[in-house]
From Swiss-Prot:
NCBIfam families: PRK01151.1. The gene is rps17e. GO terms for molecular function: structural constituent of ribosome. Disulfide bonds: none annotated. It comes from Methanosarcina barkeri (strain Fusaro / DSM 804). The keyword Ribonucleoprotein applies. PANTHER family: 40S RIBOSOMAL PROTEIN S17. It holds the Pfam family Ribosomal_S17e. This is Small ribosomal subunit protein eS17. Keywords: Ribonucleoprotein, Ribosomal protein. Signal peptide: none annotated.
Length: 64
């Protein structure tokens, strides 16, 4: 069983992937900095969750 992400985290992640798909990588630390750069999220917890979700989606996109 996996974790269920909140709707706002998914929405932000999908918007980031739509607009900046080629910038994100499979590295969490890089994505964390990019999420900070492209959004106005002030909460560290929310930023990390969005970065983790983006990292997971990018890794799955590159596999297929």
């Amino acid at each position: 069983m996996g974790n269920i992400r909140q709707t706002n985290i998914k929405r932000i992640a999908f918007q980031l992937l739509e607009n900046h798909r080629d910038v994100f990588t499979k590295d969490f630390e890089t994505n964390k900095a990019l999420v900070t750069k492209y959004t106005t999220i002030e909460s560290k917890v929310i930023r990390n969750r969005v970065a983790g979700y983006v990292t997971r989606k990018v890794a799955r996109m590159k596999v297929y």
